[in-house]
Amino acid sequence: MEHLTRNSQSPLLFGPETTFAAYVAQFSGHNARLETLGIFLSAVVRATNDVPFFPTLYKTDEDKFRLRKLATRLSDHALEVCLSLDCLNDLQLAFQYENFIVHTFVDGDQSYSSWRRLGDVIASMLALGYHERVETRSRIPDFLVELRQSAFARIYTDDKEVSIFLGRPPRLSRRFCHFRIPIALDSFEANESASGTEVVGPANEIKIDYRAGCSWAALCALLKEEILELFIEKNREHCVQRASVIWAKAEAQWKQLPTHMRYDVSCLNDYRRSPFERDFLISARLDHIHIRFLLRFILINSLAQPDDEMIQIAHEMLTLVVQAVLARDRLANSGSGLVWKVILYGLPASGIILLAILEQRNPYHFGGLSRAKVLQNLRILVAEIQIGALSHPREPNFALLTRAAQTIENFLDSEERHDHHPNGQINTHHDAAPGQMGPWASNLNLEAWDFDLGFWENLAEHPFLSNLEFPT
């Protein structure tokens, strides 16, 4: 420990000619530091999340969770010592970020510990100057410029996604950042020949890898920050105009994304694509649709009564999430895990769909969609949660997923038990007409991001569901 601490007090040296191997040699082997140990321990925790059975370390869930807790505790101790040394560098920032991710696994995405650690990561990144023009610093080798741009893009994205999920203001504003990403994905426009055939250009040479995933997520996060600002815009007309501009940017951004990076329905069955590439394609499309989903929140009059466009957006988002859940054995994490996709995209989409069905006058067809297809997606999501495919009882997101599944299942059961009015209206309230839910709707207090545990508990109080008991 003393040797590691002493090494951590030494600066990481580099110049314009420094190679990646020479840089890594400063914190590996005999030069290993506390940051090195911490990143290794973080990798152990991540592995316990992806590898259910590893006989030399754990054979049961109890062993696995014990190892996860131990590795997290040791990682925390190593980080505390690193911070006390006051020797901030690139490696420590990477360690801090990995420690934040570890706590989302151990404490949950809603925990204060995870929220605080993300704030610490942002503070360290700003102290290092990653938000400035790192590429103009002449002494920095190219690989380190790319590393710092990737770190900025990843941290900037996480700040926006966590803010949306928790309903809190973002802490890293684009207004004070020189926004650069590792790969300029949106700079390649598709050109067409005289015959109308798309010309294959440099865009097709861009590899689908972590850099590409990080870059696309950051581009989407940039637009999501603009959307977050609209939620405090008091001028309705100005808000609508800005929302239109943001969506035009999002559409142009999607069209400029290289063709081989765009999702299509056949990609999950394309044997030529790797599990990583399949996950990237779904993630990229989800990020794009999420922008439209958030924008629609700005424009509808009541979240308790979603319009047809909101329903269609939610349906596409839920369909993508369900496809990812069903194809999980053919996917590899390209930047965001499956559970995070379900929580950030799947649950909000499900919540909107439930609200829409409860408020619709026509019980068999709504929003231009097949009711049977919509209900099928909900049933699949509930089934996958209930069989434990997404979360274990000892994992922190289990309560949120389970409560959401219980509410959705209760709704699906109610669909079969309740009588319908002769004109096709669902009997959503004994005394109120469809779309007028009285006290329940006024107490819902939906915000664009309020699809956490409280939302599902409130939804359970809907008059259509409240007379049925939840399973325990």
Segments (PLM) and residue ranges:
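Transcriptional activation interfaces
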Residues: 1-78, 209-266, 472
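Long, amphipathic alpha-helical regulatory blocks in the mid-to-C-terminal portion
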Residues: 9-19, 65-94, 117-135, 154, ...
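Short coil/turn linking the two alpha-helices of tandem helical-hairpin repeats
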Residues: 48-52, 100-107, 298-301, 357-358
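Short coil/turn connectors between adjacent alpha-helices in alpha-solenoid helical repeat scaffolds
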Residues: 51-67, 103-118, 237-238, 304-309
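Long, charge-rich low-complexity segments
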Residues: 82-104, 337-346, 391-430
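Acidic/serine-rich, low-complexity amphipathic helices located in mid- to C-terminal regulatory regions
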Residues: 100-191, 212-215, 221-222, 359, ...
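Polar, glycine-rich mid-to-C-terminal structural blocks
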Residues: 197-199, 206, 218
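Intrinsically disordered, low-complexity transcriptional activation domains
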Residues: 334-338, 388-391, 411-472
